[in-house]
Amino acid sequence: MYRHPALVPLSHEHQRLLFVCRYLKKDAAAYEGFPLETQAKLAYIVKVFQEVMVPHIQKEEYLFESCAGKDAELDALIQELTAEHQQISRMYSALTENTDLEDAMDQLARSLEEHIRKEERLLFELLQQKQAGWLDRISWEN
């Protein structure tokens, strides 16, 4: 699937986050070097959210704000994705308070996976179709 160069870094982050989703699910296969204990998984997700997810969401919010008001279809999708960002953030924040941590991580993983796939299949395609000129002007700082 073609990705505009401005979207490639976000897609790479999505790939890393999709691995995290697979790892956090209840039915996760064993991955070499990744423990299956619930507390170890929690420590891993905390690290990944701080290092990858927070800056990733900031980049996407920049995209959302910059594209707002230019296309009704894009606006509706952005509104939906923004609500999902908020829900995923709430799910992450509530992990330590949850009585069934394994189930909470599984739900977070499944929600995040669905969200990422929506961004890749819908948002990025719409941006490439309707905002290609704007995407040409984006340069991400690492």
For each feature predicted by the language model, list its residue ranges.
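Small-residue-biased structural context
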Residues: 1-142
